[in-house]
Structure formats: C-alpha cells, structure tokens
C-alpha cells in the first residue's frame, strides 16, 4: 500500500517539517512500518549537509540484527578518517540517534567517488547530500520520526515524504523511502507500488555506474 505526500511553497518559506508530518500521519493506515521525510530546508546554501547512518534501528518491528552501540562508534570513526582522506572539512557534526548523524561540511570534488568511498565502510549508508536537501527516515509513524529527529523546527520551501508498508523487503531504514538520488546533490526520489519489470530494469542499471543498495532501489 504505502502513501506519498508532498508540498511546495512558491516564493516563501514555511514550517515544512510540521506540515509534512500532518500529511504523513493521515496516511499512517497505508504505511505503519517506517516514515521518511525529504525536506528542502532553509540552509545557508554554502556548505553540504550530509546525513548518514552507521547501523539500523533494531527496535520493535525491525528486521535488522541487533548490534552493540560500540560498533556504531567505530564505524563513525572510520567515516571521519575517510572524510579527512577525501579532503572534506567537517564544520559541524550532530549525533541524532545511536546510529545516525548529520554533518555540515565543505567539499569541492566529485560526489560519486566520495559516496562510493564512504559507503565502502561496512553498514555505512549516506541518506542524503545537498545544500538544501535533508533526508530523514526511520522506523515508526510520522509523529515518532518527527519527534526522534526534532523535525518540527525545520523550515523550508518544499518537501516529499513516504509512509511505508514493507511488502518486498525488510523493515529497516535501508529499505525505507524516500531515497537520495545518488550521486546528485539535492535530489530525492520516492515511488509507490510494485514494478512488474523490476528485475529486468535492475539488471540493465547494474551495467551502468549507478549503485543499487536495496531491492527497493529503482
């Protein structure tokens, strides 16, 4: 089933976090497993915002394997080392949950190579990179995710979101929507329904430079 919501404010900014929450909460009956927000926020536009995770939420309903939080800390250290090697300068970092982070950083090189190297670290996934886009997704309904990540304060111009009922893959953050439009900054994609020719398309895409991290990727 699942549910998709979106909004846009032309020529002005608004509290897109709360507005999208209200829309997605109304769709909870269509997707109770996980919720995702792709918010185009009022950032300064000078630096990249990278949201990434170093593990999964293993709470109630999760299909992920439980891990000790010390593993998350070690993966985060590996990410920091890789960022230094890539020449990225982290200006600000926030630990949002035991398994997810938000970094503000300067980076002037190729995002494809950057992303491949960051995600070569075990269980590390970049959720989004952009100067406006901030992609947040986790288990639970829209209110739970909004509260967990303090999204009620986020202002911006537009947003899309997704309430998911898992049918083709596990209940985890990795399979939740929306997806970052790798390797392009500030691009997010969400889809609904089942593609009947999915595996044919996946095979075709596998011959290109694009990566397909989940069986929900298109």
Please annotate each region the language model reported.
Residues 1-210:
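Conserved short alpha-helical segments that host acidic/polar catalytic motifs at enzyme active sites
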Residues 209-218:
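Single conserved hydrophobic/aromatic residue that forms the stacking wall/gate
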């Amino acid at each position: 089933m699942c549910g998709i919501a979106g909004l846009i404010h032309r020529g002005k900014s608004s509290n897109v976090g709360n507005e999208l929450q209200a829309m997605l909460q109304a769709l909870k009956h269509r997707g109770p497993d996980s919720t995702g927000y792709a918010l185009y926020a009022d950032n300064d536009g000078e630096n990249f915002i990278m949201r990434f995770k170093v593990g999964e939420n293993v709470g109630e309903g999760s299909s992920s394997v439980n891990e000790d939080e010390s593993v998350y800390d070690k993966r985060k250290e590996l990410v920091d080392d890789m960022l230094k090697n890539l020449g990225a300068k982290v200006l600000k970092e926030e630990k949002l949950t035991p398994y997810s982070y938000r970094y503000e950083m300067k980076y002037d090189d190729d995002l494809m190579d950057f992303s491949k190297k960051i995600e070569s670290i075990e269980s590390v996934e970049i959720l989004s990179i952009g100067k406006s886009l901030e992609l947040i997704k986790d288990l639970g309904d829209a209110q739970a995710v909004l509260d967990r990540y303090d999204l009620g304060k986020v202002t911006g111009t537009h947003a899309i979101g997704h309430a998911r009922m898992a049918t083709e893959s596990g209940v985890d953050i990795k399979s939740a929507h929306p997806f970052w439009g790798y390797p392009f900054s500030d691009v997010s994609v969400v889809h609904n329904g089942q593609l009947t020719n999915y595996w044919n398309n996946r095979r075709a895409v596998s011959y290109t430079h694009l990566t397909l991290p989940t069986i929900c990727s298109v």
